[in-house]
Amino acid sequence: MNKRLFAACLSVGMLLAGCSAKKSTTVKDGTYEETVDGRNSKVTVSTTISSGKIINVEVKDNEETPEIAGTAITELPKKIVEKNSPNVDGVTGATITSDAIKEAVKNAIKTAGGDPDSFGSDSAQASESKTEKLSADVVVIGAGGAGITAALTAQQDGAKVILLEKSANIGGVSVIAGGPMGINSKEQKEAGVAGTFTAQEVLAHWQSYNCWMDDGQLFYNIANRSGETIDWLEENGMDLVYVGNEQAAHANGFPTYHAYADQSNKLGYYQALLKQFENAGGKIYYQTPAVELKSKDNKITGVVAKSSDTTYEISCDAAVLATGGFGANADVIEKEVGFPLVTFTTGTQTGDGATMSQAIGAGKGKTIQQYHGVTSYSGIEPGSGKDEIAKAIYLATSIWVNQRGSRFAPEDLNYDTALSSNAAATQGEYYFSIMSDDMVKKVE
């Protein structure tokens, strides 16, 4: 009897112990600031918690690129507050910044004594997916510089255009660049430069510099109409200034460079073009990547795109693939290039256009390369603190030797990254940069 009573008491005791273990820890109200690594720098985020809920999130100190991370900085905090959870989808194209913001909020919850995974669990509901059918004359996939200008041109020519952008931002890598190159633009004519060189001469110089590992016909087609394209951009609100040559490394090249007049407003120029597109009747869908091309008898008949809660089936007569390259796709880079590289992208250039077009029978284009800037190797992420050492390796601060241990270039002629890759390209897969301990410590 006593044994049975003891066993019963023990069972009740275990049950009570089990219940008490599930009791949630009280989260302390307050405002918590957490600093984590972002894309370019440290990111400081302020999180306010009240009565067990996230009531405010604010990104404070940071040096993230506004044109790329701006939407993540302004919109992701609102999303976290709305869902009462840091476990929300980030902003496509600003993944690193998004992850930093979410990590900072999670750290704030932990500091307050809470469990980040328990926040929002009661209210989180999966939204129902729906299908919507649309139609257009032209679907432009990608709202970078090429996509926006293509969409606006088609809309101005009387076509009904739908523009799809996989991220929350427009501009693509065009907002990272300093400006376009052009031959025989109005500004060059005013400067007395137009007519002093031809597209064919620029092409010859370009191919020689790139060891003929490019597509000459494609380059010529672009270069031959580059002047009138720049004139068109300016007629439609973009403010460009003819510079000639920006970098000392290009002093012996052709003066083709046109810079954005206001380098702090690069995104604004493309927003102005987009506004014209929308005013003319065009429609843009953000965070809605195209996932499939439809075709019949070797002709495009439609595009399938997906947002977070809607699948769009768009019938069309033509599709413009302005998705960029594959610079943000590490697997494809290693497959095509042969080794890992960290390139300057907005994170959205993952080869979508090639993947979709090849799925319906398109051929694989020529693999081309441009010997221009040098990028970080072996996974050195910008903003990690190690990228400064990487820069010191390929800038004119050290001695370069090839695999035989011989110097192969006058390092002081490589004024910046512009000539580094061209000089190194003749040396095989890799070369060595010799630095002293003092040099490394100085950079660190």
Describe these PLM feature segments.
Residues 23-124:
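Active-site- and interface-proximal helix/loop "cap" or "latch" segments in soluble metabolic
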Residues 128-146, 162:
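Beta1/beta-strand and adjacent pyrophosphate-binding region of the FAD-binding site
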Residues 133-136, 308-318:
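Core beta-strand elements of the Rossmann-like FAD/NAD(P) dinucleotide-binding domain
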Residues 156-177:
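Glycine-rich FAD pyrophosphate-binding loop
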Residues 169, 175-283, 400, 407:
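Conserved N-terminal/central alpha/beta ligand/cofactor-binding core
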Residues 286-299:
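A conserved short coil-to-beta-strand element within the FAD-binding core of flavoproteins
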Residues 314-381:
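Glycine-rich loop(s) and the adjacent beta-strand/alpha-helix scaffold that form part
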Residues 354-356, 363-444:
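An anion/pyrophosphate-binding glycine-rich loop and adjacent beta-alpha core
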